[in-house]
Regions:
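Bacterial N-terminal signal peptides
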Residues: 6-19
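Surface-exposed, charged secondary-structure patches
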Residues: 24-26, 102-161
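Short, well-ordered alpha-helical segments enriched in acidic and aromatic residues
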Residues: 73-100
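A mature extracytoplasmic/lumenal domain signature
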Residues: 94-96, 151-155, 187
Length: 207
């Protein structure tokens, strides 16, 4: 399907070219294709200040958890942004819920943000609330420059809390490009009544 669409597009463009050539002389050479949509097309995107943050998948994920974790206070959002591809996505899955006396029924939904939007929407929360997240197990798949990690994580309000306030899965889609690793997207969902973590997600698997 992709191939046939490509041929249709080429035929369409060829028709335009033949049409134009019948009316005027050949145009001057066009400018090089735009770099928008590539890493080179985002020169202002924060670079990783510490190459050790992004040189391995383990370091990439450890850095993400390190950046968002800590007592109430400012987070290093440039360090956070630098872990992601420009215009990468962070998606929170919102479960469906029945109506209660305090709120109406809610449909299941997905809230998707860019790294910039995530920082803007959560900055005030982190400034006034402690938040500590750590990975307890990873399931890793890899092919070529594509890596997928299901990271089982725990969240605590204070570092020394015995029990986590929540647990869930962070699903990372990661790519290797320009000599380093990047998060292309991050989706997450949490345990709740009726949805608990299976035992297989509480131990490491894969690479």
């Amino acid at each position: 399907m992709i191939r046939s669409c490509k041929f249709i597009l080429c035929g369409f463009l060829m028709g335009l070219t033949l049409n134009a050539s019948a009316q005027q002389s050949a145009p001057a050479a066009s400018a090089p294709p735009s770099a928008v949509g590539t890493l080179a097309g985002h020169p202002d995107w924060p670079a990783a200040k510490n190459p050790g943050d992004v040189d391995t998948v383990d370091h990439l994920l450890a850095t993400l958890y390190d950046v968002v974790s800590g007592p109430a206070g400012q987070r290093d959002w440039d360090r956070f942004r630098a872990l992601f591809l420009p215009d990468g996505r962070i998606v929170s899955l919102v479960p469906e819920s029945a109506a209660t006396k305090d709120r109406p029924a809610r449909k299941g939904d997905a809230i998707f943000l860019t790294p910039d939007m995530f920082a803007q929407q959560n900055d005030s929360y982190f400034k006034t609330n402690g938040f500590f997240e750590r990975s307890i197990a990873n399931r890793v798949e890899e092919f070529g420059n594509l890596i997928e990690v299901w990271s089982t994580s725990e969240i605590r309000d204070a570092k020394d809390d015995v029990q986590p306030s929540s647990r869930g899965i962070d699903s990372f889609q990661i790519v290797h490009a320009h000599g380093r690793f990047w998060i292309a997207s991050l989706l997450f969902d949490h345990e709740r009544p009726g949805v608990t973590l299976p035992a297989k997600y509480l131990k490491n698997a894969g690479l």
